[in-house]
């Protein structure tokens, strides 16, 4: 089954890519960590499988992964969120729930306008205890940005915390600067709505007062370590 969103995904008049000095410095920190992780990725080998971000639920990968029915069935993936320009073959669309939001991997693309939709979609799949693959062409920019937005929204984490978590799971992620800037501004929105705290080291007491049912990434990881 295919759900196709054809809304034009480009920067609108209200979306500015002009960075403040603070935004520029914060992006430099993320890019430095990303470069270190990318070096390890090339030095120690690559994997032919999608990256498991959260246990038994969320996978991040590329177009090749999304086109491999045997691989998808092995990982019990039922849902595919495709955010690249290319569609999937009919064989995949007939056997999986495919949601296609085509968008170019360009800094001026307004990817943030889709965060509410993709976050709700992924959270719905999580609640059904089913598995989803989020992918773009290479699994490093568009799809990584979508996953980062989900981690920020539903695990109450700052961009820095979510980014450091994700590069441990998939070191080759490389969102373009425009996407990183939009994630920073999305973080500001979540801070204003008290869904995340402004300080990476701040107590999570205020967050725990919220209605959001999913733990922070640290709580999530700790719980699963105890279950093993």
State the predicted function of each range:
Residues 1-47, 119-131, 146-228:
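PTP/DSP superfamily signal
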Residues 44-47, 64-66, 82-89:
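Short, polar loop motifs at secondary-structure junctions
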Residues 52-53, 59-61, 76-84, 97-102, ...:
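Beta-strand cores of modular interaction/reader domains in eukaryotic scaffold and signaling proteins
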Residues 65-72, 199:
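Short, acidic/polar
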Residues 72, 87-96:
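Short loop/helix-cap segments at secondary-structure boundaries that form the rim of catalytic
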Residues 99-132:
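Helix-loop module immediately N-terminal to the HCX5R catalytic loop
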Residues 140-145:
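Glycine-rich nucleophile elbow surrounding the catalytic serine of serine-hydrolase chemistry
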